[in-house]
Amino acid sequence: ANPCNPAQLTPCAGPALFGGAVPPACCAQLRAQQGCLCGYARSPNYGSYIRSPNAARLFAICNLPMPRCR
């Protein structure tokens, strides 16, 4: 089964774009989809979320490493 499902990251969209509280569901999905994030970063639909200034804050709050995309 492919764990990459950007729709599951919906709980992260608000905090990624506007800041504010990060729900536990967001951290759970970021953790589950860590291997997918670089693909999203390259995508025209989702790249702005991953590259947004608030994204680093999400990873910090969730205690996850920032994805290092090549």
Swiss-Prot record:
Potential phospholipid transfer protein. It comes from the Eukaryota. The keyword rRNA-binding does not apply. GO terms for biological process: lipid transport. InterPro entries: Bifun_inhib/LTP/seed_sf (IPR036312), Bifunc_inhib/LTP/seed_store (IPR016140), nsLTP2 (IPR033872). One of its GO terms (molecular function) is lipid binding. Keywords: Disulfide bond, Lipid transport, Lipid-binding, Transport. Disulfide bonds join C4-C38, C12-C26, C27-C62, C36-C69. This is Probable non-specific lipid-transfer protein 2. Belongs to the plant LTP family. B11E subfamily.
